[in-house]
Amino acid sequence: MEILNELISTYKDHPKEGIDFKDVLEIVQHPIVFKELILKMASSKIVSNAEALISIDARGFIFGSAISFQVSKPMIFARKPGKLPGELIKKKYTLEYGENSLSIQKKSLNNFYSFAIIDDLLATGGTVNCVSNILKDNGKKITGLLTVVELIELEGRSKFDFPVESWLKCK
């Protein structure tokens, strides 16, 4: 999908100096490209081998929701602090430009064993690693990670013991 490269905008020094932020939102403004991407992502073995999908706050929700709809599988939300009600499983993580934490509703994991993780971008792997640790700590299996963009120089995929599929690899 060569066109993806044209639809990813780069913002220098965002959210802080030294970070080149890759923005995937323009993909959604091109429905034919978005649909083609979702169909490709949805056909991945990572998705077919999972009982449920787990998407990461917030841009991962865009792709995760569309894939969930396409394959009729449940989607679980990994959210930033203060966004989810109920009993939560929380974990802190470090990312390229700071520290944060993610929460998942405990009851949302109860009925499923295997999960595909979906996000918009893989950089250092901190966010995905946080989600994978929550899942593993709760006895769950990860079928893999699907991401639109992968920043290959940051070698995020090297942190994982599960498959990673990305549709656009950038420096």
UniProtKB/Swiss-Prot annotation:
Record-level GO BP terms: adenine salvage; AMP salvage; purine ribonucleoside salvage
Compartmental location: Cytoplasm
Main location: cytoplasm
Gene Ontology molecular-function annotations: adenine binding; adenine phosphoribosyltransferase activity; AMP binding
Keywords, ordered alphabetically: Cytoplasm, Glycosyltransferase, Purine salvage, Transferase
GO CC terms, sorted: cytoplasm
Major enzyme class: transferase
Gene3D superfamilies documented for this protein: 3.40.50.2020
Stored CDD domains: PRTases_typeI
Catalytic activity: AMP + diphosphate = 5-phospho-alpha-D-ribose 1-diphosphate + adenine
Listed InterPro entries: Ade_phspho_trans (IPR005764), PRibTrfase_dom (IPR000836), PRTase-like (IPR029057), UPRTase/APRTase (IPR050054)
Pathway this chain belongs to: Purine metabolism; AMP biosynthesis via salvage pathway; AMP from adenine: step 1/1
Disulfide bonds: none
Listed EC numbers: 2.4.2.7
Keyword Isomerase recorded: no
Organism superkingdom: Bacteria
Biological role: Catalyzes a salvage reaction resulting in the formation of AMP, that is energically less costly than de novo synthesis.
Subunit text: Homodimer.
Family under the similarity heading: Belongs to the purine/pyrimidine phosphoribosyltransferase family.
Name under which the protein is recorded: Adenine phosphoribosyltransferase
